[in-house]
């Protein structure tokens, strides 16, 4: 659709539960300068003050603004414009559920057009070198917690090309889990360390040499980027370079 000459912008209606994941996948794989906007609703059409109609109207208005494509794929909800990379669903029921907790929003919808105040610097859409393969490599997310065992992780790693560890603090994990992962990594398993904390980033530390770090990506977005990276290469250093660029 993005390649059609009669299409100036794209609006996708989507359920809110996984909207941020679809938005980020498209942000990495749709190579276009045209606006791509996702939107949805938190309240049903039968509810008093349903949010769907206004969200859809403002999504279309946003997609009609040609310069929006420079910002990558966005989510427009509750009169707010969010970058696909940073947006998260933060509340189970509230209409203002989508937040850019790390870096804030890109801007707001006002008077029928987006008014934007910052621009993503990481690679996306028209600057992305990643492409969607016919089949994505298998990657699982492991949530670290008190009591997580090595056997739990070994089971989850079976048949997987990569694991994303939703780590404690700065991407840490129980020592026995780390010991169990090292031989799997030697066999080719790629391990990405993300954080279960709501802010901050995960960076390299000597204690977890050989892992890839997710920087400020949420675990679910780190999984998407790892799948696309593994479709291109299995070299850990090259995968880290991809995470540093996107």
Q: Model features per residue range: what roles?
A:
Residues 15-16, 41-44, 168-170, 195-200:
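Short, ordered loop/turn segments at secondary-structure junctions
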Residues 83-170:
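Accessory alpha-helical/coil subdomains and C-terminal extensions
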Residues 12-34, 173-182:
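Short Gly/Thr/Asp-enriched flexible loops that form oxyanion-binding sites at enzyme active sites
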Residues 5-9, 31-36, 68-72, 77-78, ...:
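Short coil/turn connectors at secondary-structure junctions
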Residues 4-19, 159-170:
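Short acidic, glycine-rich surface-loop motifs adjacent to enzyme active sites
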Residues 170-246:
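C-terminal non-catalytic interaction/assembly regions of soluble proteins
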Residues 38-110:
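Internal gly/pro-rich beta-alpha loop/helix module
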């Amino acid at each position: 659709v993005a390649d059609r000459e009669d299409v100036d912008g794209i609006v996708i209606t989507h359920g809110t539960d996984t909207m941020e994941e679809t938005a980020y996948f498209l942000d990495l794989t749709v190579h276009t300068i045209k606006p791509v906007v996702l939107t949805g609703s938190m309240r049903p059409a039968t509810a008093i003050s349903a949010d769907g109609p206004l969200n859809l109207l403002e999504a279309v208005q946003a997609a009609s603004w040609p310069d929006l494509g420079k910002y990558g794929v966005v989510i427009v909800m509750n009169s707010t414009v969010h970058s696909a990379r940073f947006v998260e669903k933060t509340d189970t029921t509230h209409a203002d559920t989508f937040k850019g907790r790390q870096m804030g929003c890109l801007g707001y919808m006002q008077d029928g057009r987006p008014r934007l105040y910052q621009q993503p610097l990481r690679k996306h859409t028209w600057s992305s070198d990643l492409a969607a393969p016919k089949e994505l490599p298998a990657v699982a997310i492991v949530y670290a917690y008190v009591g997580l065992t090595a056997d739990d992780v070994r089971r989850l790693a079976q048949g997987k090309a990569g694991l994303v560890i939703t780590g404690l603090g700065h991407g840490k994990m129980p020592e026995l889990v780390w010991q169990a992962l090292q031989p799997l990594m030697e066999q080719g398993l790629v391990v990405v360390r993300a954080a279960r904390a709501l802010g901050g980033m995960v960076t390299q530390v000597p204690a977890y040499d050989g892992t890839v770090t997710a920087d400020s990506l949420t675990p679910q977005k780190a999984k998407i980027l790892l799948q696309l990276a593994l479709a291109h290469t299995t070299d850990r250093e090259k995968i880290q370079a991809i995470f540093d660029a996107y």
